Amino acid sequence: MSKDATTKKPTGLALYTAAAEKASAVVIDQYSTSFGWATKLLGKYERQHVRNIYALVRIADEIVDGAAAEALNNYIGADPHSMVDKFEQETYRAVECGFSTNLVIHAFAHTAREAGIKRDLIQPFFNSMRTDLFQRVHDK
């Protein structure tokens, strides 16, 4: 029996995933008190997956019209569109391989792999985010 089999503390990829999921929990707690509280009605397993999805959505929104847009406002050559593209591509890569250096993307990829969330569901979300880069009033 290996040492890993006798310890309850995760190691390796499991430890990294646990840290990523804690980061996602911080995102939801900081950005949406009501949504964070609502997730407490869910079971622990479901709650974490909802947090992982919420965190990815929240960060993508920050790239488009939140903190990133604010930070890049005075930066010459700033291109939020390319930031969204890179975020999206990293998301696909992480879903495929099960790892990202971006903790929020890593946590989302863990959920996507567990729940069978594929590109056909992810891509429309990122397309929607891109519309916020150009369209400020939505009629639909």
Q: What are these model-derived regions, one by one?
A:
Residues 1-140:
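Acidic catalytic motifs of isoprenoid enzymes
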